[in-house]
Design a protein with these regions (language model features):
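NAD(P)-cofactor binding segment of oxidoreductase domains
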Residues: 1-15, 37, 41, 105-108
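Glycine-rich NAD(P)-binding loop of the Rossmann-fold in SDR/ketoreductase-type enzymes
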Residues: 2, 21, 33
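Membrane-targeting and insertion segments and their boundary/processing signals
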Residues: 8, 12, 16, 70-77
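SDR active-site strand-loop-helix element
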Residues: 15-21, 53-55
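Oxidoreductase cofactor-interface core, primarily capturing Rossmann-like NAD(P)-dependent enzymes
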Residues: 25-126
Length: 127
């Protein structure tokens, strides 16, 4: 949040943040709770425009050490994605490149408000 405060003080009117599907400040899961608390903190700062991207599992090449749980999830993603329909579509995996393209598409959008973008919306923005 310190970087966001600094950006706001420097005159930024829009903030775009990558959070996570399932983010909620009251979640029992530490990761999702931290993401939710961060979202709430950003809302409280009062940017004219706040875009919160909530991707599922990010797919693509990564630098750094490989985590076992993440490796298992990446291997299982194609099968899991095929089974996730309807309201569960938001839990599907998504390429990191798609999320990056959505960010570029959102940058500079002057319409005020807080917008939540899940996988399907990010895919539309990236096209």
């Amino acid at each position: 949040l310190a970087a966001a405060r600094g950006a706001l003080m420097a005159g930024a009117t829009q903030m775009i943040v990558v959070s996570s599907v399932g983010a909620a400040a009251k979640s029992r899961n530490f990761y999702l709770r931290t993401k939710g608390e961060t979202e709430d903190g950003l809302r409280a700062l009062g940017f004219e425009r706040l875009d919160i991207l909530r991707p599922g599992l990010l797919m693509g090449d990564r630098a750094g050490p490989k985590r076992m749980g993440e490796g298992i999830a990446i291997a299982a993603a194609p099968l899991a994605d095929a089974l996730l329909h309807g309201s569960l579509r938001r839990y599907r995996s998504i390429p990191g490149e798609t999320v990056a393209r959505a960010i570029v598409a959102l940058a500079g959008n002057a319409q005020p408000g807080v917008r939540i973008h899940e996988n399907d919306a990010m895919r539309r923005l990236a096209d």
